[in-house]
Design a protein with these regions (language model features):
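Metal-ion/cofactor- or nucleotide/acyl-coenzyme-handling active-site neighborhoods
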Residues: 1-209
Length: 209
């Protein structure tokens, strides 16, 4: 309800991966959608397609994603640190391109992507980076069998996957370097919202005991 009201008042909704469909199903048609992952199964995340949505797709994404988005509002962005494609990018753009820095997940890169596009205030929903009931707010079978570990932030315990934990570590590193350039609010009671209050206390449980 909070996000619905904010959208009605003019706040653009930016979705990543499977949250695009989740938003569409709940009356929150996104203004934009971002994808980073190169695996082919991610092409399902762009559906249902919308003529009103701007699709920001990383150049490393699977070709089928670009095929499905033909005729839609599509922007291609490039990841900083992707040294394999540096020669190709220089051949195409010369020195006139600006790769997007950030962590290894789509949410972390999206913060920097939209900061580069002029946005300086972000309110992030569903960015828990831990398991609260299930690993995602919607079905995503690709993550069903991932190993679960216990982590601690300021004496509060969280269950998360190795990917969640790595993302949390990258979040601390990223905001430590670039956090002064944007205003970031993370909603909810997940791992990330607690890290913001206690950025130096993230540990695996066995390191604490």
């Amino acid at each position: 309800p909070d996000l619905l009201e904010k959208k009605k008042n003019g706040m653009p909704v930016i979705a990543v991966n499977g949250s695009h469909k989740y938003c569409m199903d709940h009356g929150l048609a996104p203004s934009a959608m971002v994808m980073l992952d190169s695996r082919e199964f991610n092409n399902r995340f762009i559906h249902p397609l919308s003529k009103d949505c701007k699709y920001f797709i990383s150049s490393q994404c699977h070709p089928s994603v670009f095929d499905n988005l033909e005729g839609y509002k599509l922007w291609i962005w490039h990841c900083a640190g992707d040294t394999d494609n540096e020669d190709l990018l220089k051949e195409q753009y010369g020195d006139n391109y600006f790769p997007v820095m950030g962590g290894s997940t789509v949410t972390l890169r999206s913060i920097h992507l939209f900061r580069m596009l002029g946005f300086s205030k972000f309110e992030v929903y569903g960015f828990d980076s831990c398991i609260i009931g299930q690993h995602h707010a919607y079905e995503q079978k690709e993550n069903d069998d991932e190993q679960v570990i216990d982590v601690v932030v300021a004496d509060k315990e969280f269950r998360c996957t190795a990917a969640h934990y790595h993302q949390a570590q990258e979040f601390v590193q990223m905001t430590g370097k670039t956090g002064e350039f944007y205003d970031l609010a993370v909603h909810g009671d997940g791992l990330i919202s607690h890290i913001i209050k206690n950025p130096d206390s993230l540990r695996r449980k066995e390191e604490v005991n």
